C-alpha cells in the first residue's frame, strides 16, 4: 500500500480576516511539495461562482508572478463533483495568502507525496485468498463463486496503472486517465497486482469484471495528493456520464497523512453511488488517524493472513474503529506487468478482495444491488472472524456465502469453474509453513496479548519555506471554527465481443464459456 508514514496534526486555524483554515503537517515523514497547495471551496457556492473564483485566483497569480519576476505554474487540476469543488496548483506565498482570505474558500492544505509500502516476498506461491472467501474454515483452496463473476460491474483502479495487455485480463482492463505522467504504462506494478486480485482469470475474485486504470502514481510509486483527488473526481464523473452508477466500484489502495481534501473526495465518490474499497494502512496503528481511514463513508479494509490472524509481521495491518472488515492480504499472488505474476503483502492486497466481491454482488443482482450499503452488507453477513483484530476493532472477515459460509447468498447447487482457465494439475497448495520469528503465531498457538502499536516515527522537522518565512497557516487562530464538513455527520454492458461466436482476434472461445458455475482448485 502507498502511504505517507505519519499522522498529520491539525493545528488551530490561521487567518488574517476570515481566512480559510490551513492544515500544516506537525510530524511524519510525508514529502511536502514546495509551493504546492490544495484548495477546497465552500459547499454552498454555485458552479458559476466556482468558475469566477478560479478566474479571480488566476488573475491574482498572474499579477504576483509579473511583480516578482519568478515562475509559478498556477492552477493545475480542478474538480467539481456535486458540492465538492476545488483545485490544486503551484502558487507564491502572497498568492496563497490572498486565496485563503477569499470568502468562498473553506480549506487550504499543502500538497504532498507518498511512497510504496507493498513488496514482493517470494517469486512463486499459491493464492490462498480466493479459497478463504468461499469456505467456512481456513486451509481449503477450492474457490466457489457466482456464475456472473462480476460481468456487469466496472472497477476503477486508482493506483499506478494497469498492464492492460496482460493475458490474465482478456481485454477487460482499459486505460481511463493519467494524472501523473504521459506514459500509459504501469512501471511500478502495484496497480496491476491490485487489478489482478480484483479480476484476473487465475488470481481474481470477479473474473469477468471490467477494470479501468486511473494512474496517480509514478514509476517510483509516488504521487501527490492533488493527483489522488483528480483521479477520484475523474472516476466519479466518468461513472456518472457513462451510466455506471449502481455498478461502479473504486479500489483505493493508497493513503497517508490525514488529509481532509482527499477524505472529502473519497466521500463524494461514495455519495455519488460508487462503492469505495480502501486499504487501512500498514503501520500497526489506528486506521482512523490517516487517509483513507479518516473518510467516514468508505469501506476500510484490514489485512488478514492464512490462519485468520490480523497480519502483525513486516508492514502490520492497521486496526481501530475505522476498520470495517478484514480480507486476505498476506502473501497474495497476483499479476505483474509484462505478463508475469508475483506475491505482495499489505492492506493494499486486502482491499481488492472486497472490491472484487462487490463486483460479484453486482452480477448476482443483475445491477440491483445497493452499493451504498455494500460495506454493512459484507460485515453483517460475515461468518468468519479474525483471531487478533486489535484494540477497538471488528473481527469480521470477508466471505462470499458459498460452501456453507454465511456471507452474501448465491446459488450453491451449481459447480463453478473460472472463465478462461480449466483446472490445472500441480496448483494445489503445499502444506502451510510457520512464519518467521516475530511474525504471526503458527497454528495451535495463541497470539500475544494485543498491545497498541507505536505511532509512525516522527519527522525530524518540516522543511523550511525557501523564502525563509513560515508557511501560511503556521500561526494558529483559535477563533476559526473550521468548515462545516470538518466533522462529517443506467449500467455497464458486457463488451460486444463477449457473446460473439466462435472467435475474437484469432482467439477461439472455449467450450466452458457459457457454463453456469464451476469449482476451481488453486
UniProtKB/Swiss-Prot annotation:
It is an enzyme of class 3 (hydrolase). Its main location: secreted. Residues 383-397 have a biased composition (Polar residues). Keywords: Glycoprotein, Hydrolase, Protease, Secreted, Serine protease, Signal, Virulence, Zymogen. Residues 20-117 form a propeptide. Residues 1-19 form the signal peptide. Residues 432-459 have a biased composition (Pro residues). GO terms for cellular component: extracellular region. Disulfide bonds: none annotated. It is found in: Secreted. Secreted subtilisin-like serine protease with keratinolytic activity that contributes to pathogenicity. This is Subtilisin-like protease 10. It comes from Trichophyton verrucosum (strain HKI 0517). The lineage of its organism: Eukaryota, Fungi, Dikarya, Ascomycota, Pezizomycotina.
Amino acid at each position: 500500500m502507498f502511504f505517507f508514514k505519519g499522522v498529520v496534526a491539525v493545528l488551530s486555524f490561521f487567518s488574517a480576516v476570515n481566512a480559510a483554515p490551513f492544515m500544516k503537517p506537525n510530524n511524519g515523514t510525508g514529502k511536502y511539495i514546495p509551493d504546492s497547495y490544495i484548495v477546497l471551496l465552500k459547499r454552498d457556492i454555485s458552479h458559476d461562482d466556482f468558475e469566477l473564483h478560479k478566474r479571480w485566483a488566476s488573475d491574482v497569480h498572474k499579477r504576483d508572478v509579473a511583480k516578482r519576476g519568478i515562475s509559478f505554474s498556477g492552477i493545475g487540476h480542478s474538480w467539481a463533483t456535486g458540492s465538492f469543488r476545488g483545485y490544486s496548483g503551484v502558487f507564491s506565498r502572497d498568492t496563497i495568502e490572498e486565496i485563503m482570505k477569499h470568502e468562498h474558500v473553506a480549506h487550504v492544505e499543502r500538497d504532498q507525496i507518498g511512497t510504496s509500502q507493498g513488496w514482493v516476498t517470494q517469486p512463486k506461491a499459491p493464492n490462498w485468498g480466493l479459497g478463504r472467501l468461499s469456505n467456512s474454515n481456513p486451509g481449503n483452496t477450492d474457490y466457489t463463486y457466482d456464475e456472473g463473476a462480476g460481468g456487469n460491474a466496472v472497477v476503477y483502479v486508482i493506483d499506478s496503472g494497469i498492464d492492460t495487455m496482460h493475458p490474465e485480463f482478456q481485454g477487460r482492463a482499459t486505460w481511463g486517465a493519467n494524472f501523473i505522467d504521459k506514459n500509459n504504462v504501469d512501471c511500478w506494478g502495484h496497480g496491476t497486482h491490485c487489478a489482478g486480485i480484483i479480476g484476473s482469470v487465475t488470481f481474481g475474485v470477479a473474473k469477468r469484471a471490467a477494470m479501468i486504470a486511473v494512474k496517480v502514481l509514478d514509476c517510483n510509486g509516488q504521487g501527490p495528493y492533488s493527483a489522488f483527488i483528480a483521479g477520484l473526481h475523474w472516476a466519479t464523473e466518468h461513472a456518472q456520464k457513462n451510466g455506471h452508477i449502481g455498478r461502479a466500484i473504486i479500489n483505493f489502495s493508497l493513503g497517508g497523512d490525514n488529509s481532509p481534501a482527499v477524505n472529502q473526495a473519497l466521500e463524494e465518490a461514495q455519495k455519488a453511488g460508487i462503492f469505495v474499497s480502501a486499504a487501512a494502512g500498514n503501520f500497526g496503528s489506528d486506521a482512523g488517524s490517516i487517509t483513507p481511514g479518516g473518510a467516514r463513508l468508505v469501506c476500510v479494509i484490514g489485512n488478514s493472513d492464512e490462519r485468520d490472524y490480523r497480519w502483525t509481521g513486516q508492514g502490520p495491518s492497521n486496526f481501530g474503529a475505522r476498520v470495517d472488515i478484514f480480507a486476505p492480504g498476506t502473501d497474495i499472488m497476483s499479476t505483474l506487468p509484462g505478463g508475469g505474476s508475483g506475491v505482495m503483502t499489505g492492506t493494499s492486497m486486502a482491499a481488492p478482495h472486497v472490491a472484487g466481491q462487490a463486483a460479484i454482488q453486482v452480477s448476482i443482482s443483475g445491477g440491483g444491488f445497493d452499493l451504498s450499503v455494500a460495506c454493512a452488507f459484507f460485515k453483517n453477513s460475515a461468518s468468519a472472524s479474525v483471531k487478533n483484530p486489535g484494540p477497538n476493532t471488528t473481527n469480521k472477515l470477508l466471505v462470499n456465502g458459498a460452501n456453507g459460509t454465511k456471507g452474501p447468498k448465491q446459488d450453491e447447487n451449481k459447480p463453478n469453474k473460472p472463465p478462461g482457465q480449466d483446472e490445472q494439475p500441480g496448483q494445489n497448495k503445499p502444506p502451510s509453513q510457520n512464519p518467521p520469528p516475530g511474525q504471526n503465531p503458527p497454528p495451535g498457538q495463541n497470539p500475544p496479548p494485543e498491545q497498541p502499536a507505536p505511532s509512525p516515527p516522527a519527522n525530524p522537522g518540516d522543511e523550511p519555506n525557501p523564502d525563509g518565512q513560515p508557511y501560511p497557516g503556521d500561526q494558529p487562530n483559535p477563533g476559526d471554527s473550521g468548515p462545516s464538513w470538518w466533522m462529517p455527520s443506467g449500467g455497464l454492458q458486457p463488451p460486444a465481443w463477449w457473446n460473439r461466436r466462435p472467435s475474437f482476434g484469432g482467439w477461439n472461445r472455449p467450450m466452458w464459456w457459457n457454463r453456469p458455475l464451476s469449482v476451481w482448485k488453486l
